[in-house]
Amino acid sequence: MIDENFKKKLAVSRERVEDLFYFENSKEIGRGTYGLVYKAVPKHSNGRFPNKEYALKMIEGQGFSMSACREIALFRELRHPNLICLQRVFLTNEKKVWLLLDYAEHDLWHVIKHHRTAKTKKVPIMVPRNMVKNILFQILSGMHYLHSNWVLHRDLKPANILLMGDGGPDMRGRVKIADLGFSRIFANPLKPMAELDPVVVTFWYRAPELLLGAKHYTKAIDVWAIGCIFAELLTAEPLFFCKEEDIKAQNPYHYDQVKRIFHLLGYPSDTDWPDMKKMPDHQRLLNDARNEGTPIQTFPNSLQRYFDKWKINSQSSPYRLLVKLLTVDPLKRVSCEEAMNDIYFRKMERPPRETDDVFNRYPIPYAKKEQQITIPIDQFQQQQQQQQQQQQQQQQQQQQQQQQQMQQPQIGPPQMMGQPQMGQPQMGQPQMGQPQMGQPQMGQPQMVPSQMGQPPMGGPHPGVVAPDGHAHQMMQQQHQSQHHMQYQQMHDSMQGGMDDGGPQAKMMRMGNVPVGRYGPMGPPYGPQDFHAPQGPPMMQMMPQPGPSGYYQQRPGQPPGPGPQGYMNPQMGMTMGMRPQGVPQQAYMPGRGMPPPQGPNPQQQQQWQQYHR
């Protein structure tokens, strides 16, 4: 037992992180396996901490967890030019653990994203080939050091590969491997690795033996992840992209991910991987493929065809090294040391070194992490709460308006809010028997609907009152459109894109607009009948710019602010294409007809008289 007086003296003398460092706007610059990472600078230049930028990682939870102990112990023992350096450990009186690490301005995730974004904008700027070589060599060098000391990283991915910026000339452009939260010593383990941690490595970088439930695994799982990162550097897209709907599952098996791997590399034969049939989840894989109707056992190797579109020849040295790194049999997979001696690196003018500047002394074109997070976390959370409150208030107002209009008996057709009732025409407003908007007569100028007042999201105008029985349907359509937008933005933000640029690339080619997943895609990527002009030439609608984030009109795309791919079965035309002043549910092309459900026979007769 520790003496209480000693504990009190220790608490008084213990240094607080807040007293030693400035946190720049409390901005989170990263997230590790078990904690958040913040950027900090020393408050006092007294020589204890050099006046430079640091990364402070706060371990989540109370006290020392086993993962935190492992990470701290490994960081204190391991020293290599390509490993992030741990400067100091702080333990606060609130039992919070802080790790003071070297600060890296960039990481491979943002570097690859930068080039992928340029590609989707049809400005193909790929990662320079010499830069790819230097990055790969330094990753292999750092991992060879870990493996030589019997340490598995087990969470290699682009976000955990850091690049030093302009902080110092001796460290500029150096690769640093970070986040040892999943790392383990694999020399003579007391238990199988799979029993200690059943799920390791992010899906896209997970080796096939892990996906098939191997109980024992080796350093080959890190080599596979390096191969996936190498392919992503060459193409700016994840090689084995797959949805991660069960990322928190306790079982490492993932059918879609295994299918994606075998779709590119081919289904292994008994010669390619003799032990595959011994994997615990091999039979489960075959059962899932049989239930899905997928002939997974007949998949050929299509990796060469995949890289042909990136102009990477199958006889080139990078392709040959990639095949060695992505060998499905872990016993035949190349080691980090063997990969460092590959001809791919020997063909350089001078051999690469672990301390080289991967930017080759050129200006760094990538944004820093703190520039990509423009506002503090607390302010961002406040803005999110305000937006949610505003949305709730708008929904409540719309519901109240719709309830009030439903309670009032309607004699004529639904009216726009703020417009005169039937029998009370104003100057400039069409009266009974006069042509409505969008129905010009001979000799009369064409009337173009105003851009203001068009329904957002392709849903009903907030001032339009639906016929009886259709208010619930209008609300449901609006809620569904909002849900699709939110889901599309949340899901596609995680997706790096695959083959033709992925969902993000398609969104940017179409004007940076999320496209509905559950309806046909708009032209030029969908049916051309949606693209046909609506009505005679003199009655076509003018293009509507819509709010920010919607379509920017281009040739070959239909106008209107509504999302493409959603059709109203009662309208027969794309949302946002009806004449102004006529409710969505009541409009049919050619003539205004009542919807098949809703109004009673008396109201239907009044509707027909009104639209004659």
Curated annotation (Swiss-Prot):
The record's section on Gene3D superfamilies has: Phosphorylase Kinase, domain 1, Transferase(Phosphotransferase) domain 1
User: Which residue ranges does the record assign to the Protein kinase domain?
Assistant: 23-345
Q: Please give the family membership noted in the entry.
A: Belongs to the protein kinase superfamily. CMGC Ser/Thr protein kinase family. CDC2/CDKX subfamily.
Q: Relate the protein's function as given in its record.
A: Component of the Mediator complex, a coactivator involved in regulated gene transcription of nearly all RNA polymerase II-dependent genes. Mediator functions as a bridge to convey information from gene-specific regulatory proteins to the basal RNA polymerase II transcription machinery. Mediator is recruited to promoters by direct interactions with regulatory proteins and serves as a scaffold for the assembly of a functional pre-initiation complex with RNA polymerase II and the general transcription factors.
Put simply, this protein is called Cyclin-dependent kinase 8
Matching entries from SUPFAM superfamilies are given as: Protein kinase-like (PK-like)
Q: Name one GO cellular component term.
A: nucleus
Species, as recorded: Caenorhabditis briggsae
Q: Which GO terms describe its molecular function?
A: ATP binding; cyclin-dependent protein serine/threonine kinase activity; protein serine kinase activity; protein serine/threonine kinase activity; RNA polymerase II CTD heptapeptide repeat kinase activity
Top EC class per UniProt? Answer: transferase
| The entry's keywords | Activator, ATP-binding, Kinase, Nucleotide-binding, Nucleus, Repressor, Serine/threonine-protein kinase, Transcription, Transcription regulation, Transferase
- What are the Low complexity biased-composition ranges? 403-455, 472-483, 543-555, 564-573, 600-612
Q: Where is the active site?
A: D155
What catalytic reaction does the record list?
A: L-seryl-[protein] + ATP = O-phospho-L-seryl-[protein] + ADP + H(+); L-threonyl-[protein] + ATP = O-phospho-L-threonyl-[protein] + ADP + H(+); [DNA-directed RNA polymerase] + ATP = phospho-[DNA-directed RNA polymerase] + ADP + H(+)
**Origin organism lineage:** Eukaryota, Metazoa, Ecdysozoa, Nematoda, Chromadorea
Which superkingdom heads the taxonomic lineage of this protein's source?
Eukaryota
- Positions of region (Disordered): 403-483, 543-612
Sites where the protein binds ATP:
I29, G30, R31, G32, T33, Y34, G35, L36, V37, K57
- Which gene is the coding source of this polypeptide chain? cdk-8
Q: Name one GO biological process term.
A: G1/S transition of mitotic cell cycle
